[in-house]
Amino acid sequence: MSSISKAGIFIDVKQLLDFTYRMNKEMSVADRRDYGSQLIKYNLDMITNFTMAYHRRDEKICFDAGDKHYDINLKGEKRVYVDALEASFDNYMALMEFCFATLMFPRMTTRKRRRRHKHFMELMAKISTGIMKWSGSIYKQVFVSERREAG
């Protein structure tokens, strides 16, 4: 579990999971389901809003995550930023998988939960593939074009 702050994002997944576990012990099933859906919706917002905009002229990425707006300056250690973005999504995938399996369906049969979970993870895979394609295109635009200019 890692924290990432280089890209202007600070995620501490372990802390989030600990908080979720503590809340979970005190909650009724209805409250837990409501809390789980809110947590997932928030994280889905974080991911879907991460489609953002790349400004070639200014060499920066702008995006909204939840209620926060970030500008990531790509000048300088550019590769570090892209790595940090990719790593942050791995953390979100792990967090959402946990939330979905344990909070959303506490009284479901294992079979039903597996089926729902599979569907959810397929959705997450589609979203994360889109994200990786996006960060890959940033890599090509920023780094490959630099090599061409230098060569």
Language-model features: locations:
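Amphipathic alpha-helical assembly/interaction segments
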Residues: M1-G151
